[in-house]
């Protein structure tokens, strides 16, 4: 290669390969709560495939397992522990209800 072309080549950086989030020995099952709970957000939502770093097949199996666990009441549908205080009615000023008069 010419010396001018070599200037633009980037050096290859070494990277550490990430371990898969689900080891090969783990079975994806609705009863395996320790595995399922890793793929649910704090609000109780199923995390996306990008966040989980799962394959398409694994994400489908996790989603089905979570939905089965919810139906069997092993998992809550929503986790609203934090948001309960947000929707409580606060002390507000009383409304003044007056008589409406029509101008003729």
Swiss-Prot record:
GO cellular component, one term: ribonucleoprotein complex
Location(s), subcellular: Plastid, Chloroplast
Statement: the UniProt record of this protein carries the keyword Nucleotidyltransferase: no
InterPro entries registered for this protein in UniProt: Ribosomal_bS18, Ribosomal_bS18_CS, Ribosomal_bS18_sf
Region Disordered, residue ranges: 84-104
GO biological process, one term: translation
A GO MF term: structural constituent of ribosome
Keyword list, A-Z: Chloroplast, Plastid, Ribonucleoprotein, Ribosomal protein, RNA-binding, rRNA-binding
NCBIfam families according to UniProt: S18
Family: Belongs to the bacterial ribosomal protein bS18 family.
Subunit structure, interactors included: Part of the 30S ribosomal subunit.
Protein's name according to its UniProt entry: Small ribosomal subunit protein bS18c
Gene from which this protein is expressed: rps18
């Amino acid at each position: 290669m010419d010396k001018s072309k070599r200037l633009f080549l980037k050096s290859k950086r070494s990277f550490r390969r990430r371990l898969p989030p689900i080891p090969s020995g783990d079975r994806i099952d609705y009863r395996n709560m320790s595995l399922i709970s890793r793929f649910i957000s704090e609000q109780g939502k199923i995390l996306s495939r990008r966040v989980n770093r799962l394959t398409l097949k694994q994400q489908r199996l996790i989603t089905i397992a979570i939905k089965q666990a919810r139906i069997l009441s092993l998992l809550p549908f929503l986790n609203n522990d934090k948001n309960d205080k947000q929707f409580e009615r606060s002390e507000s000023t009383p409304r003044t209800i007056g008589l409406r008069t029509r101008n003729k």
